[in-house]
Amino acid sequence: MADKQRKKVILVGDGAVGSSYAFALVNQGIAQELGIVDLFKEKTQGDAEDLSHALAFTSPKKIYSADYSDASDADLVVLTSGAPQKPGETRLDLVEKNLRITKDVVTKIVASGFKGIFLVAANPVDILTYATWKFSGFPKNRVVGSGTSLDTARFRQALAEKVDVDARSIHAYIMGEHGDSEFAVWSHANVAGVKLEQWFQENDYLNEAEIVELFESVRDAAYSIIAKKGATFYGVAVALARITKAILDDEHAVLPVSVFQDGQYGVSDCYLGQPAVVGAEGVVNPIHIPLNDAEMQKMEASGAQLKAIIDEAFAKEEFASAVKN
């Protein structure tokens, strides 16, 4: 699908995240066609018109207000539609209302004849990625979530500011849920092959308490931003653009995305954030980082928490009746 000369993306959800993602695609010259779908048709028309005025500064692209039927020949459908996270609300608080939205959207996309890749960003992203897989009947690899891509970027940036190294040169991951049960994989965090734990000791950068504080600032970043400005959207939009480029260009890039779990970390039948090779077929190959005992326990706990919520939600007839996988 993604090796056609004209690469087509359909975006469903033209809120703060969706419109920021569309702007990121225009800015970076990603895709040659972008259709925007939302309940508020005039908003999509206005955004398409506004974005088109930036094309003379970037690269040619067809941008338009789309309908679900336009997904029939798309390479990628990106789902940002859903109720936003409010101040004081966790991502998991959004489950039922966003499951209903996801079921409706995915059903309509599949009915169009769409055969490409789903990229899910609406929260709680791991659960909604799982739901997209269940409602679509698609193979696991062709349903991808943004996962811990943003959390990992936040982690690398926070570390970069502490150790005075370009964030792009820091190799470190956040894994698990995109949410409160996520964890930092300190056992593999490194700069130029030097473990960060050793780097901290040799350069007297961070003590144990400061390391904990740094991780907590990463984990709780969304709450801080939401309290100040009502929503997070720029960071996740650029993360989505990066994943989009990897898929459309068949890059085989290693990115921390939401991947189906088949027991590799003691977790099964759910999606969780972990590094994976990403290309034209979606998840080409999950990368199973060998975790230490403490990290493995955190991964299992994160998966168990999400699985319990999934099982409770899909026990309800309105969701169980729509399952295709």
Swiss-Prot record:
Q: Which reaction does it catalyse?
A: (S)-lactate + NAD(+) = pyruvate + NADH + H(+)
Q: So what EC number does this one have?
A: 1.1.1.27
Catalytic residues in the record = 178 (proton acceptor)
Keywords of the record = Allosteric enzyme, Cytoplasm, NAD, Oxidoreductase, Phosphoprotein
Where, in this chain's numbering, is substrate bound?
85, 91, 123-126, 151-154, 232
Question: Which parts of the sequence bind beta-D-fructose 1,6-bisphosphate?
Answer: 156, 171
Which CDD domains does this UniProt record tie to the protein?
HicDH_like
Assembly and partners are described as: Homotetramer.
Q: What is this protein called?
A: L-lactate dehydrogenase 1
User: Per the UniProt entry, what species is this protein from, by scientific name?
Assistant: Lactococcus lactis subsp. lactis (strain IL1403) (Streptococcus lactis)
Lineage per the UniProt record: Bacteria, Bacillati, Bacillota, Bacilli, Lactobacillales
